[in-house]
Amino acid sequence: MKTSIRRAALASAAFALAVCGGVRVAAADPVQWNGKAEAPHYKEDVFPPWQHGQNNDALKRGFEFTVPEVDDLADFHGDITDPKLVLYVGGNYFFAMAPLVVEFEREHPDYKGRLYWETIPPGLLIKQIEAGGTITSGNMTWTARPDAYFAGLKKIDQFVKSGLLASPAVPYVTNTLTIMVPKDNPAHVTSLADLGRPGIRLAMPNPAFEGIARQIDAALKKAGGAALATAVYKTKVADGSTVLTHIHHRQTPLFLMQGLADAGVTWQSEAMFQEQAGHAITHVDIPTAQNSTAIYAGAMVKGAAHPKAAKLWLGFIHSQPALAIFERYGFKPYTPGATGG
């Protein structure tokens, strides 16, 4: 009997370790759970979706069924039935999409309730484009071919040249990096250099498909040379103290709020959103001399099903009403001659 209980406990611990990307979680601790099988004690609002249905402009929602941690599809928004505009948006401003859509629909009421948008990382959105707009999440597979795609300006230019996107590339705002930490900053992280310290657990964007990783690498090298970048993205990945995220704008704050990581580099806007949402998150500023700037841009996808709608959104995205929404989260309007990407 004791052997079977021990095996069950080990299996439970192994599962918890696997789902958290190699970071050991307190949930596997029999002392914390009083040696009993219990439902998690997590606060429901720690888990996405964090907008409580606001990032969905569907007019008829039918039966509501959202279960944080289990059934939520937090990066897929709107009604897939018959959209009049499909947007693939690099997820760095998922939180700004609801007010942007509301303003767009106010200006263009014919589109009310007819937008569908996705906010997974830009590299993964390209994979979806290459798959004909088809994606599978959990047990569900659907197809939503994009009308417009949004990412860093350099990537947009690259895909315009390759023929995937139609010219012109439309830049609209810029963003800078910050270090996101739990509200009480228990690891006392004060700078990028601190991220190389042994024992500091990091949640970092994956260079394979998250464009922010390029800017982070540049910032780390400015702060501590190649040695710091290697420590964060090579040495600490190898020893398990850096976990690479799949969707940094969802996972980094989630890991921090659960105590699974001590810090992670994100866009400043993402930390501001978490703070405005009242989550137990704060940030550590990165000096301008060490920081990197991203230029956000978009373009119509070649062969878009709704080219008129795509052009309307691309015109709207750098209008004054749209820029005012972006500025709530620390974005700055793009000005010609700005450097970044």
Predicted segments with their positions:
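Exported/periplasmic ABC-transporter solute-binding proteins
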Residues: A27-R114, G123-K127, N139-R145, K154, ...
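Bacterial Sec-dependent signal peptides at the C-terminal "C-region" and cleavage site
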Residues: V19-A28
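Surface-exposed patches in mature extracellular/periplasmic domains of secreted proteins
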Residues: G113-Y116, S167-A169
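Bacterial N-terminal signal peptides
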Residues: A11-C20
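N-terminal post-signal-peptidase region of extra-cytosolic proteins
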Residues: E130-G138, F159-L165
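Phosphate-/polyanion-interacting regions in eukaryotic proteins
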Residues: W117-E118, Y149-F150
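Bacterial N-terminal signal peptides that target proteins for export
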Residues: K2-S12
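Conserved SGNH/GDSL esterase-like catalytic core that processes O-acyl groups on lipids
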Residues: T119-I135
